[in-house]
From Swiss-Prot:
A motif (ITIM motif 2) lies at residues 794-799. Its main location: membrane. The modification Phosphotyrosine is found at Y762, Y807, Y822, Y842. GO terms for cellular component: early endosome; external side of plasma membrane; neuronal cell body membrane; recycling endosome. The chain crosses the membrane at residues 688-708. It is found in: Cell membrane. Predominantly monomer of isoform CD22-beta. Also found as heterodimer of isoform CD22-beta and a shorter isoform. Interacts with PTPN6/SHP-1, LYN, SYK, PIK3R1/PIK3R2 and PLCG1 upon phosphorylation. Interacts with GRB2, INPP5D and SHC1 upon phosphorylation. May form a complex with INPP5D/SHIP, GRB2 and SHC1. Phosphorylation of Tyr-762, Tyr-807 and Tyr-822 are involved in binding to SYK, GRB2 and SYK, respectively. Phosphorylation of Tyr-842 is involved in binding to SYK, PLCG2 and PIK3R1/PIK3R2. Phosphorylated on tyrosine residues by LYN. This is B-cell receptor CD22. It comes from Pan troglodytes (Chimpanzee). Residues 1-19 form the signal peptide. Residues 20-138 form the Ig-like V-type domain.
Length: 847
């Protein structure tokens, strides 16, 4: 029983471990590599039956503590359901999630990080420790170059440079060098950061030559700035055919018959070593010649030719450049070749003396019918104009520095002549019009041998109803010429005859004479109606624009072109045969933007809160490329498209707008267009409520003010009756009342008129003296007698501003003139007043 207890405990622990592991599945690289100061990217995925991950801890070199039943070790990172606790170094990042991604990043990584990384995962029902090996070196470890099993010259191969490192936070590059020099071929670099592998790979494709054999290829690891980190080198083993060169004795490879020649085949390079040797002459293998040296004893002229050596190895045969061996000998019996035989009378004939010799013959002797031809010592005899007496047998003898040859059989010269006095005759009556049927015949005087055929030129799909007769159906236009030839062994051509076909004008086109560049509005423009040819030459011209007749001259001139002159132009040219029209030519006039206007959608009155679109419409060629918008203060708006969209539109947007359009020719601007934004019912309701309340408050205050004013006036009136009255003066100023402007454009301008000035109206009222008391005043007449020195008058004046604006043609913006009224009131007492003339004085003072 005591022995059974530990075994049962072990079985239970194994079962628990197995059941726990069955709930977790991880995928990641087994080992990751890096170096001091770099970073490590750990791609990782996991799968857990219980997806509710509660905590994640990253240990460095974890060890299981049996006493605490937990893992001990340096905690690089810890994440719980309550939140993340960053590491002290803040260099470890958990890039995964609580579902299936457990990717990690350590940046920077240090040498002491080498060892095991433990990923401790805990859920509600299970726990797991996943281990990952990390190898961090003190210095960047070198990449590894992978070569194909075999490299042959001129065959494309792929060199692979592999580095077991890749990290998003630490960029690197792999550089290829050949003998320390960067290779010109472009390499393809790829990286892998997957759960299967982490690496950086560079692949280089190039075609090595035999000269690359034994050269050093380097793959250099560099950082992002190109700084050297590490490298790997390999020596190329390029398999190639033997490379050969022939050395000849004598060096110029020129010998006389009976002398000896030695040729040596030198192998400059071969990989692998060569196995067989052979010699070739003029491409044919020489028997029993399988050494690097070829000896030719007592050579003959037949041994002259091109020699090369061929050496083979396991890759294939290598062949040297050819060496031409010249064996010199005296001329052999000569033969004569007659060029251009049989010869035509009047033509040139050339005789060639052919004799095999090395070196070539330097002197020749010619014979005609067995008689030596004096002065003929060249290889060729040229007779510029052959005559019948030149016929006969020709032979020759050749001579070089080694001796004189023998005269061989001669060559016979046969002198013949082509048909004589050949002519082409037109059978039709003249003149010939385009489309007519024309018949021609070919005649000649004599021929040796007899004429067997006729030729015509130019060639065409024409009929030959009989030998020497040509019929042309539907003859074409132009000054066509026809010539015929009567042929036996050779052809004699007649002089060409012109058909002189009459036709309507051809190739009519419109050509712009000026300006040579683009046509701008206002330019002087000339159009020329051109045609290539016409027969007869007397022609007339007609110009049309869009189907409308313009003129009858060859040139159409515009002193100052306008956009309205643009259109499709064509011209007509006619003669007595017919007329021809040109293709339509489009006259395009470039002009700056014009007729600009601002259109408003849905209209120039918009309720606030809605959208308003202002469109800058224009007429321009080329089309407007840039738009600028301005408000009523001529301030440019930050909008440069054709449409200005206000959404939502506000009351503050009310005002005048204008736009400016620009193209490559110039610019133009529109007049002002006013946009009115009125309040929405909601805003009006709010403002009416506020206004009504304000008016009610003002009304109450006004009523109170009127009552106080009346009480004050009553008090002042009583005081005035008690006091000795005297003249009172006061001014009353009428305030301006603004009125809406008339329907004048916002852009209207006026001119100031200094003569239209303000005025002062002045009036004095004088009253006659009277002692007649008014009804009810008898009892108080004495008391109210005025002082003798008082002048009973009322003075009234008005400072009057005329109803006009500051400018003559601008209507003022107010409905009434602003005036200052001045009055002086004299209180009259009761009693006698001195006699005075009743009058009214009125004065206007202008200032």
């Amino acid at each position: 029983m005591h022995l059974l207890g530990p075994w049962l405990l072990l079985l239970v622990l194994e079962y628990l471990a197995f059941s726990d592991s069955s709930k977790w599945a991880f995928e990641h690289p087994e080992t990751l590599y890096a170096w001091e100061g770099a970073c490590v990217w750990i791609p990782c995925t996991y799968r857990a039956l219980d997806r509710d991950l509660e905590s994640f801890i990253l240990f460095h070199n974890p060890e299981y503590n049996k006493n605490t039943s937990k893992f001990d070790g340096t905690r690089l990172y810890e994440s719980t359901k309550d939140g993340k606790v960053p590491s002290e170094q803040k260099r470890v990042q958990f890039l995964g999630d609580k579902n299936k991604n457990c990717t990690l990043s350590i940046h920077p990584v240090h040498v002491n990080d080498s060892g095991q990384l433990g990923l401790r995962m805990e859920s509600k029902t299970a726990k797991w420790m996943e281990r990952i090996h990390l190898n961090v070196s003190e210095r960047p470890f070198p990449p590894h170059i992978q070569l194909p099993p075999e490299i042959q010259e001129s065959q494309e191969v792929t060199l692979t440079c592999l580095l077991n490192f890749s990290c998003y936070g630490y960029p690197i590059q792999l550089q290829w060098l050949l003998e320390g020099v960067p290779m010109r071929q472009a390499a393809v670099t790829s990286t892998s950061l997957t759960i299967k592998s982490v690496f950086t790979r560079s692949e280089l494709k190039f075609s090595p030559q035999w000269s690359h054999h034994g050269k050093i290829v380097t793959c250099q690891l560099q950082d992002a700035d190109g700084k050297f980190l590490s490298n790997d080198t390999v020596q190329l083993n390029v398999k190639h055919t033997p490379k050969l060169e022939i050395k000849v004795t004598p060096s110029d490879a020129i010998v006389r018959e009976g002398e000896s020649v030695t040729m040596t085949c030198e192998v400059s390079s071969s990989n692998p070593e060569y196995t067989t040797i052979s010699w070739l002459k003029d491409g044919t293998s020489l028997k029993k010649q399988n050494t690097l040296m070829l000896n030719l004893h007592e050579v003959t002229k037949d041994q002259s030719g091109k020699y090369c050596c061929q050496v083979s190895n396991d890759v294939g045969p290598g062949r040297s450049a050819e060496v031409f061996l010249q064996v010199q000998y005296a001329p052999e019996p000569s033969t004569v070749q007659i060029l251009h035989s049989p010869a035509v009378e009047g033509s040139q004939v050339e005789f060639l003396c052919m004799s095999l010799a090395n070196p070539l013959p330097t002197n020749y002797t010619w014979y005609h019918n067995g008689k030596e031809m004096q002065g003929r010592t060249e290889e060729k005899v040229h007779i510029p104009k052959i005559l019948p007496w030149h016929a006969g047998t020709y032979s020759c003898v050749a001579e070089n520095i080694l001796g004189t040859g023998q005269r061989g059989p001669g060559a016979e010269l046969d002198v013949q002549y082509p048909p004589k006095k050949v002519t082409t005759v037109i059978q039709n009556p003249t003149p010939i019009r385009e489309g007519d049927t024309v018949t021609l015949s070919c005649n000649y005087n004599s021929s040796n041998p007899s004429v067997t055929r006729y030729e015509w030129k130019p060639h065409g799909a024409w009929e030959e109803p009989s030998l020497g007769v040509l019929k042309i159906q539907n003859v074409g236009w132009g000054n066509t010429t026809i010539a015929c030839a009567a042929c036996n062994s050779w052809c004699s051509w007649a002089s060409p005859v012109a058909l002189n076909v009459q036709y309507a004008p051809r190739d009519v086109r419109v050509r712009k004479i000026k300006p040579l560049s683009e046509i701008h509005s206002g330019n002087s423009v000339s159009l020329q109606c051109d045609f290539s040819s016409s027969h007869p030459k007397e022609v007339q011209f007609f110009w049309e624009k869009n189907g409308r007749l313009l003129g009858k001259e060859s040139r159409l001139n515009f002193d100052s072109i306008s956009p309205e002159d643009a259109g499709s132009y064509s011209c007509w040219v006619n003669n007595s045969i017919g007329q021809t029209a040109s293709k339509a030519w489009t006259l395009e006039v470039l002009y700056a933007p014009r007729r600009l206007r601002v259109s408003m959608s849905p209209g120039d009155q918009v309720m606030e809160g809605k959208s308003a679109t202002l469109t800058c419409e224009s007429d321009a060629n080329p089309p407007v490329s840039h738009y600028t918008w301005f408000d009523w203060n001529n301030q440019s708006l930050p909008y440069h498209s054709q449409k200005l969209r206000l959404e939502p539109v506000k009351v503050q947007h009310s005002g005048a707008y204008w736009c400016q359009g620009t193209n490559s020719v110039g610019k133009g601007h529109s007049p002002l267009s006013t946009l009115t934004v009125y309040y929405s019912p909601e805003t009006i309701g709010r403002r009416v409520a506020v206004g009504f309340g304000s008016c009610l408050a003002i009304l109450i205050l006004a009523i109170c003010g009127l009552k106080l004013q009346r009480r004050w006036k009553r008090t002042q009136s009583q005081q005035g009756l008690q006091e000795n009255s005297s003249g009172q003066s006061f001014f009353v100023r009428n305030k301006k009342v603004r009125r809406a402007p008339l329907s004048e454009g916002p852009h209207s301008l006026g001119y100031y008129n200094p003569m239209m000035e303000d005025g002062i109206s002045y009036t004095t009222l004088r009253f006659p003296e009277t002692n007649i008391p008014r009804t009810g005043d008898a009892e108080t007449s004495e008391m109210q007698s005025p002082p003798p020195d008082c002048d009973d008058t009322v003075t009234y004046s008005v400072l009057h501003k005329r109803q006009m604006g500051d400018y003559e043609n601008v209507i003022p913006d107010f409905s009434e003139d602003e005036g200052i009224h001045y009055s002086e009131l004299i209180q009259f007492g009761v009693g006698e007043r001195p006699q005075a003339q009743e009058n009214v004085d009125y004065v206007i003072l202008k200032h």
